[in-house]
Amino acid sequence: MRIVHISDTHLYGDDSLHYGIVDTTAALRRVLAAAEEIPGVDAVVLSGDLSEDGSVASYRTLRDLVDPWACERGAQAIYAMGNHDHPDAFAEVLGPRTRVHTMGRHRIVTLDSSVPGAAYGSLDAAQLAWLQSELSESVDLGTVVVVHHPPTHAVTPLLRLLELDDPHALLGVLDGSDVRLVLSGHYHHPLVTLERGIPIVVAPGVTNTSDVTTPENVERARIGAGFALVDLPASGAPRVSLVRAPSERDGELVFELDADGIHDIARSFGRPE
């Protein structure tokens, strides 16, 4: 199975610019154009933070760009919720927030790790029980789980304060199942790692790129967009290629936060103390 994995599009329902700088719709168009010639795509997976303003119009813009792109290739478009997404508007345009997609002899399961009014992630007992029930029966070539907040620790200081709450609860459900891969976003930079032997793939952001080279008390983002091309063979480990969608403005500063700015956001949108 070949997957084009896109995340953190942060679209608007109007012509607003992200941080007053980034045209996120144009960035998504660049990403799709960069993937234009890839053969054999089976799925286009978007792993959350699809909208910035939570408007129905923003989700329609996303659907109207991605669905035809996927359809032209005989691929399936699959969408997951992120912390910026609005549950009702998402569901109205894109369908259920948690879902099982059968892809031939594979299966893709989307989860909703969003917490209303917050930026950290969480999966409640009911959702984990549902996932465990779905995974109780395996499929021939295994399952891919899509969840916005990665079940692995962040690299940058702000995102370490906005991680998935209790990732071990999710990993415990995945243990011993047929899950072969987890696709995530949220961190706005590419990351590939293993948790309990399961590959975790975090896609680059579309709206901007987190700078992982900053000092400990600095969070910085720059203009830059890309996606992950994920090949999941019938057996063995996935192969992940990271692809940039270049623009003339790549590398321009989007925002920079010092320690006070980081902790202000964490107090407002992080886990309750």
Feature-to-residue mapping (PLM):
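Catalytic metal-binding/acid-base residues of hydrolase active sites
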Residues: 10, 50-51, 84-85, 114, ...
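Active-site-proximal beta-strand elements of phosphoester/diester hydrolases
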Residues: 1-13, 105-115, 144-147, 198-204, ...
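His/Asp/Glu-enriched short active-site or ligand-binding loop at hydrolase and phosphoryl-transfer sites
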Residues: 203-213
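Acidic/histidine-rich helix-loop elements
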Residues: 7-27, 52-54, 86-92, 117-125, ...
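Divalent metal-coordination and catalytic microenvironments
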Residues: 3, 8, 44, 49, ...
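N-terminal active-site segment of His-dependent metallophosphoesterases
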Residues: 1-61
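His/acidic metal-ligating clusters that form di-metal
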Residues: 31-43, 120-201, 228, 238, ...
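Extended active-site neighborhood of metal-dependent phosphoesterases/phosphodiesterases
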Residues: 55-137, 169-175, 196, 216, ...
